[in-house]
Structures are given as structure tokens and as C-alpha cells.
């Protein structure tokens, strides 16, 4: 993913790599990207996280994945607080079936799904922010 001369170049690259974030205005991309890069000694910018973060999960054997999933479900089932589950409908990680299961067990999450958004909703659309605020604060008139 390399280095970038400036924040605009980094934001453009992240936008190309992160189409699953959904529709995000340019000024928001710049703000998001400012938290995703770090400056190198020569002044160039580089990513502040490992873009290959998911590789170990993809490399798991089926048995290891099933064991890990059982542990995660066991922990999820113990949650006592209200849970808001936000799912971008284009997510390649959180399936519709898993999201629905999360509404039926454990804390019985309240599910919000947004079309045109992938696994990492940015919560920058006013209607998305309003829905989250309604969950956290109660409906505001």
C-alpha cells in the first residue's frame, strides 16, 4: 500500500481500497484518512494499521474457526446490556444469517442494516447518525 505524498493522495488510495464503506463525501474521507496514516521521517505518509489484518483469520482451518466461533457465541450469549448491531448490507464478513442469529439469542441485538455499505459503516450519513442516536438516547423529536 506504500507511501503517499500528502493526505489527499492517501485518502484517494483508501477510497479505492475501501469501496465497502459506502458513499462517503470527500471531506469525510480526508478526516477518516487522517486517523489511518502516520508520517514517516522523510515527511511521506503511510498506513497506520496493517491492511493484512484479516489474513490470520482467513488462514484458519475449519476446525479452528469452528472452535473460535463457539467461544465467541458463548461470550455473546452472556452479554446483559442492550446491543445495537450495525450491518452494512454489502458486508463480506458479517452475513445476514449471523446478524439474524444475533437478534434471536444472547442479548437479542437490535439490528440496523444499511444498503450500499460494506463491513465498516462510517456513520457519517445523517440518517445513520440519527438511528444510532435514537438507540443511545431514545427517539429525539
Tell me what each language-model feature is.
Residues 2-59:
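Conserved alpha/beta-hydrolase catalytic His-Asp/Glu region
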Residues 108-110:
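Conserved beta-strand segments of alpha/beta enzyme cores
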Residues 19, 81-84, 141:
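Generic structural signal for secondary-structure transition and capping sites
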Residues 2, 6, 64-71, 94, ...:
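Soluble or luminal CAZymes and related metallo-dependent hydrolases
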Residues 114-129:
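Catalytic histidine-centered segment of alpha/beta-hydrolase-like enzymes
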Residues 131-139:
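C-terminal alpha-helix
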Residues 37-104, 113:
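Conserved serine/cysteine hydrolase catalytic core
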Amino acid at each position: 500500500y506504500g507511501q503517499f505524498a500528502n493526505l489527499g493522495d492517501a485518502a484517494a488510495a483508501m477510497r479505492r481500497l475501501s469501496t465497502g464503506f459506502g458513499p462517503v463525501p470527500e471531506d469525510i474521507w480526508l478526516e477518516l484518512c487522517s486517523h489511518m496514516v502516520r508520517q514517516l521521517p522523510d515527511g511521506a505518509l503511510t498506513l497506520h494499521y496493517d491492511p493484512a489484518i484479516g489474513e490470520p483469520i482467513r488462514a484458519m482451518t475449519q476446525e479452528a474457526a469452528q472452535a473460535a466461533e463457539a467461544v465467541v457465541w458463548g461470550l455473546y450469549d452472556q452479554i446483559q446490556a442492550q446491543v445495537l448491531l450495525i450491518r452494512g448490507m454489502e458486508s463480506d464478513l458479517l452475513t445476514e444469517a449471523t446478524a439474524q442469529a444475533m437478534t434471536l439469542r444472547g442479548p437479542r441485538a437490535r439490528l440496523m442494516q444499511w444498503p450500499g455499505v460494506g463491513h465498516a459503516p462510517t456513520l457519517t450519513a445523517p440518517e445513520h447518525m440519527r438511528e444510532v442516536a435514537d438507540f443511545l438516547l431514545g427517539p429525539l423529536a
